[in-house]
């Protein structure tokens, strides 16, 4: 396949045009006064969004060289979304400003490689300053403010603050499309997994088709139980304690073992419940180990030399209640050692830090939440399908922003954290003139988010930036900034206009990374379009009569 190549000024001009086109579509969504973007599909109603990364993912330009610029800028938004879950529009605005200023210097003869080195030096100083500014998240009110700013909806902010209050910061929150037009949530207490009872004969509440057992003994094994002889020692040991409540979590229970449990249930000799173990393969063993630690039991596995008939009462877990329906099982308040549970959570968090797989990370986070004992389901409703999807995206952004704020703290919002970080560049040691130029590129770019917020609110961006700086000096308060909703200049921290430090940091790091790539690119290669054959036409299907 033949390729087409462009170089130097022509290549940089194509990249810049692609970057500017992408940024123009994305940055209109910045801030509470930002506009929506409607995205047409080949079928169905258009999707309407206020989310920068969603807009970025839709942009594909016709010119292949310009499209390269757009796709590089998309990387800044996507990577920020992956790391922090929010801040995608800020990353886009920053990257475009750096590319715009940097390409002017390259056109004037500056060495792009030294410019990039200057950008990297400046980034390190700026990230350190953002981390210094960060204040740890303490109150429910601050959580509400972070979520409200991200979602641009006080109702979503209040809902997430309530949920975090009830399930803790490590709890799992899943977001679903609801049936009505309102926002609702449902709390699931304890550890839940997606396996239900093996037989409906174990049901204790026939109206709800649920099996509920209070304070049972819990046998945990990765073995399939078919022979009754494997179960007898455990059944006898439980009955010897004067209790008859037993939950069995196993790969499967069938044959005469299942028949024995059902018959004893019918006679009232035992009150058993058998459920299938969650997960598959190695993940199943890990989840069974989690259940064992949560309930204070021991995983009976032949891999560690334990056969089922060797199980004693001491090996069985305990919990305040186990509830199971045909699809799900919930273990409420396991009797496991609190220190052992915390140690397991720490171990899982270390695995989250080291894993490179997004899927594994998600599953590990679910396990942490289940051990922490909190799962919430948010049901998002709206009058129409496009409104529902747009609102759901805002709830997801707000949730991600809240988690990011818990992780690394909060900084003043409204673009002020980046504005305040500019002074950190004064202490950066430079060796070449181009490095000093790169620091000036960063100084100008860091003003851009505040400038764009003001423009989207119908104000003059440069006037707002200068006024914020003047008021900060007059009040000797670095938290002073512009409230886009009211048009007033206020103490942003007191007004609850705050951003997660992790979001601001990630946006800056990814913007610098993409800007460095664009500035140091001097040639673009893409596939040449196939020439059209003269006189060729698409053959038509012959007419057919039926």
Swiss-Prot record:
Enzyme Commission number(s): 5.6.1.7
Binding site for ATP: 29-32, 86-90, 414, 499
Cystines in this chain: none
Leader peptide range in chain numbering: none
Pfam families: Cpn60_TCP1
One Gene Ontology term, aspect cellular component: cytoplasm
Stretches of the chain forming a coiled coil according to its record: none
Sample GO molecular function, one term: ATP binding
PROSITE patterns hit by this protein: CHAPERONINS_CPN60
Cellular localization per UniProt: Cytoplasm
GO BP terms, alphabetized: protein refolding
Domain of life: Bacteria
Reactions the enzyme catalyzes: ATP + H2O + a folded polypeptide = ADP + phosphate + an unfolded polypeptide
InterPro entries membership: Chaperonin_Cpn60_CS, Cpn60/GroEL, Cpn60/GroEL/TCP-1, GroEL-like_apical_dom_sf, GROEL-like_equatorial_sf, TCP-1-like_intermed_sf
Record keywords, A-Z: ATP-binding, Chaperone, Cytoplasm, Isomerase, Nucleotide-binding
SUPFAM superfamilies per UniProt: GroEL apical domain-like, GroEL equatorial domain-like, GroEL-intermediate domain like
Family listed: Belongs to the chaperonin (HSP60) family.
Function, as annotated: Together with its co-chaperonin GroES, plays an essential role in assisting protein folding. The GroEL-GroES system forms a nano-cage that allows encapsulation of the non-native substrate proteins and provides a physical environment optimized to promote and accelerate protein folding.
NCBIfam families assigned: GroEL, PRK00013.1, PRK12849.1, PRK12850.1, PRK12851.1
Subunit structure: Forms a cylinder of 14 subunits composed of two heptameric rings stacked back-to-back. Interacts with the co-chaperonin GroES.
Name assigned to this protein: Chaperonin GroEL 2
């Amino acid at each position: 396949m033949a390729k087409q190549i462009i170089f130097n000024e022509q290549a940089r001009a194509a990249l810049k045009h692609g970057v500017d086109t992408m940024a123009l579509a994305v940055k209109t969504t910045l801030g509470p006064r930002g506009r929506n973007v409607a995205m047409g599909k080949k079928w169905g109603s258009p999707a309407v969004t206020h989310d920068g990364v969603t807009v970025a993912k839709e942009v594909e330009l016709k010119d292949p060289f310009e499209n390269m610029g757009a796709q590089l800028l998309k990387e800044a938004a996507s990577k920020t979304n992956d790391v922090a879950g929010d801040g995608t529009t800020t990353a886009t605005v920053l990257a475009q400003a750096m590319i715009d200023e940097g390409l002017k210097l390259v056109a004037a003869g500056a060495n792009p490689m030294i410019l990039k080195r200057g950008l990297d030096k400046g980034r390190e100083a700026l990230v350190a300053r953002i981390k210094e500014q960060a204040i740890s998240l303490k109150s429910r009110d601050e959580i509400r403010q972070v979520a409200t700013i991200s979602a641009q909806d006080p109702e979503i902010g209040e809902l997430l603050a309530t949920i975090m209050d009830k399930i803790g910061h490590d709890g799992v929150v899943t977001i679903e499309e609801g049936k009505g037009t309102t926002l609702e949530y449902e709390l699931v207490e304890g550890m839940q997994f997606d396996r239900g009872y093996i037989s409906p004969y174990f049901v204790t509440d026939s109206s709800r088709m649920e099996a509920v057992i209070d304070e049972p003994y819990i046998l945990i094994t990765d073995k399939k139980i078919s022979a009754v002889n494997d179960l007898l020692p455990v059944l006898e040991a439980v009955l010897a304690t004067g209790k008859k409540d037993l939950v069995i979590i196993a790969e499967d229970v069938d044959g005469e073992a299942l028949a024995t449990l059902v018959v004893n249930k019918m006679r009232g000799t035992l009150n058993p419940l058998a459920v299938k173990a969650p997960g598959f393969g190695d993940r199943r063993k890990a989840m069974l180990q989690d259940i064992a630690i949560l309930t204070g039991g021991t995983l009976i596995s032949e891999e560690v030399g334990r056969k089922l008939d060797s199980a004693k009462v001491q090996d069985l877990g305990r919990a305040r209640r186990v509830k199971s329906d045909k699809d799900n099982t919930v273990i409420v308040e396991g009797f496991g050692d609190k220190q052992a549970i915390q140690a397991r959570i720490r171990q899982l968090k270390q695995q989250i830090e080291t894993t490179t797989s997004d899927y594994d990370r998600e599953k590990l986070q679910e396990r942490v939440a289940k051990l922490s004992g909190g799962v919430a389901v948010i049901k998002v409703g709206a009058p129409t399908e496009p409104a529902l999807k747009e609102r759901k995206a805002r709830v997801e952004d707000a949730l991600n922003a809240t988690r990011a704020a818990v992780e690394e703290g909060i900084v003043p919002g409204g673009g002020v954290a980046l504005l305040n970080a500019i002074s950190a560049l004064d202490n950066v040691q430079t060796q070449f003139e181009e490095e000093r130029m790169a620091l000036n590129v960063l100084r100008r770019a860091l003003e851009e988010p505040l400038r764009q917020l003001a423009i989207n609110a119908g104000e003059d961006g440069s006037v707002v930036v200068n006024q914020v700086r003047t008021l900060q000096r007059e009040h000797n308060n670095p938290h002073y900034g512009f409230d886009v909703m009211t048009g007033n200049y206020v103490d942003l921290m007191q007004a609850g206009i705050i951003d997660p430090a992790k979001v601001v940091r990630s946006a800056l790091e990814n913007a610098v990374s993409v800007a460095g790539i664009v500035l140091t690119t001097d040639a673009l290669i893409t596939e040449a379009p196939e020439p059209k054959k003269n006189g060729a036409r698409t053959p038509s299907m012959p007419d057919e009569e039926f």
